[in-house]
Amino acid sequence: MKNLERLFAEKLLKIKAIKLQPANPFTWASGWKSPFYCDNRKTLSYPSLRSFVKFEITRLVLERFGQVDAIAGVATGAIPQGALVADALNLPFVYVRSTPKDHGLENLIEGELRPGMKVVVVEDLISTGGSSLKAVEAIRRDGCEVIGMVAAYTYGFPVAEQAFKDAKVPLVTLTNYEAVLDVALRTGYIEEEDIATLNEWRKDPAHWETGK
């Protein structure tokens, strides 16, 4: 396991951004029930951790993608993270809505991109990958090239990994499900018996049910 994955997992657990509720699962926008929830937006309320996330995402953008013309954040969770990274890199920033505004200019992309720009998308969390890749499609329709995506966290579902592969979008993340579970177990945040529930959910999250 990479040091960054473990380190960020430790930081998320320290601020209680990881929630485990097998008996009272969370419902995601996709409709999936989940005993596990990562609320990494809480990092915004901790200045030192906010700076850590900005620095590490910025570093990954530079190391993995080289020449970048603009940063795009996926609304709403990745707007602040994306803006911080764009500021650190002195690059233009835009954010992509899930749906166009129903008034005014009815924009889907807020900000200005020019055709031919090389864009890196910043996302706060990857689950199924659906909303993230819709943002990619919107940017491509504007005539820009999406050269990659950096996310703070991913659940690492096979359906998402395949979707990113099909869309030809390289994805890098600060941490992931496996790293969080490993650190959570070692630090006593979860118990061994919790692992079985979490593993059952991970195998088939679309059909997982409480107590099954």
Swiss-Prot record:
Transferase as UniProt keyword: yes
Ligand binding (orotate): 127
Similarity-based family: Belongs to the purine/pyrimidine phosphoribosyltransferase family. PyrE subfamily.
Quaternary structure and partners: Homodimer.
KW Disulfide bond (keyword) present: no
Pfam family, one: Pribosyltran
Catalytic activities: orotidine 5'-phosphate + diphosphate = orotate + 5-phospho-alpha-D-ribose 1-diphosphate
EC number: 2.4.2.10
InterPro entries, per database record: OPRT, Or_phspho_trans_dom, PRibTrfase_dom, PRTase-like
Stated role: Catalyzes the transfer of a ribosyl phosphate group from 5-phosphoribose 1-diphosphate to orotate, leading to the formation of orotidine monophosphate (OMP).
Pathway where this protein functions: Pyrimidine metabolism; UMP biosynthesis via de novo pathway; UMP from orotate: step 1/2
Binding residues annotated for 5-phospho-alpha-D-ribose 1-diphosphate, in chain numbering: 97, 101, 103, 123-131
NCBIfam families xrefs: pyrE
Record keywords, A-Z: Glycosyltransferase, Magnesium, Pyrimidine biosynthesis, Transferase
Biological process terms in GO annotation: 'de novo' UMP biosynthetic process; pyrimidine nucleobase biosynthetic process
Cofactor(s) needed for function: Mg(2+)
Gene Ontology molecular function, alphabetical: magnesium ion binding; orotate phosphoribosyltransferase activity
Cross-referenced PROSITE patterns: PUR_PYR_PR_TRANSFER
Protein name in UniProt: Orotate phosphoribosyltransferase
